[in-house]
Amino acid sequence: MSEENEFVGEMGAVAAETAIAETNRTYAGAPEQAAAASITRGEANPPTEAMASAAVCAHSGDTCESSGDRLQPKCDGAAEVRDIACDVVIVGCGVAGLYCALNLPSTLSVVMLAKTTVDECDSMLAQGGICVQHDDADYASFFEDTLRAGHYENRCESVDLMIRASRSIISDLVKRGVDFERDKAGNLRYTREGAHSRPRICFHSDITGDEITSTLLARVRELPNVRILEHTCMDDILVTQAEAQVNAENAAKNEAAVQSGTTQNATNVENQDCAAHDAAAPATPRGGDSRQPRTRCCGVLAHTADGAQLRIFAGQTLWACGGIGGTYPRSTNFPSLTGDACTIAARRGIALEHMDYVQIHPTSLYSTRPGRAFLISESCRGEGAVLLDANGNRFTDELQPRDVVSAAIYRQMVAEGSEFVRLSFANMPKDEITGHFKNIYKRCLEEGFDITREPIPVVPAQHYFMGGVRVDRNSATDMPGLYAAGETSCNGVHGKNRLASNSLLESLVFAQRAAWDMCRKLGAKAPVAQTYPEQPCGADAQAYERLCAEAKRKTRENAAKCGPQNTTQTCAQNVGQNTAQTEPRSAEQPGSQTPAQTCPQNPSPSDTDRTASSKEVVCA
């Protein structure tokens, strides 16, 4: 490796030397052969046809080019190959990636990749805020709100961890310089959004994501052990040898599962043919599992805007590269978010989960301009904005879960033959509009609408992906050495439909847990200690048992009412009562009906609850 191309920390050197030797031994040594063997040529096997056109980079041409708003990577397989070594490589520079880096010690070398620029991430776009457990009494209601919004398909273990970690996360953000809104007494202000039973959302005007992400990015830029590479697109992961047979087998199972409509894909399975290799396998890179698994991630393969290929060897790898919105014609996401990690996972036989769980946000600004849809925050409705039909009448309860409100809007549009409905701010004081929602106010003026004087046209748009790469409570995938966090991952927090303002919190909590687990694997001490017990205690434990039992009961009832597992079957009359019952709004709701909903799947067999063991937990 040339000195200018390496980034080796004190611990990274050991991992790099072992991984490079292992990779070269696997791929016969030549860089070109290594690159060729590491990437599947031609068409990938993406989870959906929508991803096939814009997910993992195809290798043809010689430079990375931009076509409109969508990145069109073009790489020459015979281009220069540069080797980089580090302890941890993080793919993505949103809040999950940044917070993981901040929770790693300075003794570890870290490389972060941004597909375009560091500020082109969906974390920057989050408007409404970030949830927090308001007080001790809020645990059960926060938990139940999350379950109701998710149609009780949530993984209870993950919901519990997120809620109990929330206050320490907010405190840490404040210490790092995040400026949340406060009242005159200096206390945090809270707003409310759809399906929340009480205000529990911290915010910064209507640009909370920008405030959090920009602050974390500034802190990361101060770290001498972190290197950020912009305009660097991940093509594949690097793995140790003996992968071919097992991963090809699992990739075929994944593809078959997707084609058959099964949402939980095949995981790595035991293969007796690999036993001989396991016994004779060389030592794994630093940070590897002591059991020496037959297949282990040891970094990523990527390419840069100048056409160079990068082999980034790392002891631990984190995928934090966002969702799939770039594959949709109308989305609030950046066009560069095209499900790259999910496509690689499908090809590599890494478990995926709930690939059909896509959230449609009820209110994006209707516009004939091309490009990303502009989100109208749900907190607008939480503060009093209402949806109106063509006659100026309300037609639904605006504070129901997002999927319910989106369905109601769609039905209204069909009934009217219209391309949008209207959102009125008439119930909101002007200073609240221009203060709390100043960014939305400004953007609407650019489109010719003054929201202090008139309703604005809104339409549903793809917004969030609840599925993704399946991970455990520490954000680890089923491939050793590989983690996933943020919208890339599926830890089960959101169930079938995400509760408003849970995305930033979930990303931060589980990115931090990934960092802690990496530190354990790398033998390093995390700079921020865990402040909450691994399992709920006292009143929280009792609420946890009750809510998990309720979730199991609801999923059994829904499965019985809706028939066999069929995630596309509509069952409005049977499932309609499972949505959150928000407090009544003062205005009448002419024409409102129970929205159609999609029947939930049966609970995943691996969605284990701790109800049996929670009484034995020793509380910290």
Model-flagged regions — what are they?
Residues 84-86, 307-316, 478:
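Core beta-strand elements of the Rossmann-like FAD/NAD(P) dinucleotide-binding domain
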Residues 88-112:
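N-terminal Rossmann-like FAD-binding beta1-loop-alpha1 element of flavoenzymes
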Residues 118, 344, 350-456, 517-519, ...:
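An anion/pyrophosphate-binding glycine-rich loop and adjacent beta-alpha core
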Residues 131-162:
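Glycine-rich active-site loop/strand segments that organize a redox cofactor
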Residues 175-246, 285, 289-308, 313, ...:
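Conserved redox-cofactor binding core of oxidoreductases
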Residues 316-370, 374, 502-513:
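Glycine-rich loop(s) and the adjacent beta-strand/alpha-helix scaffold that form part
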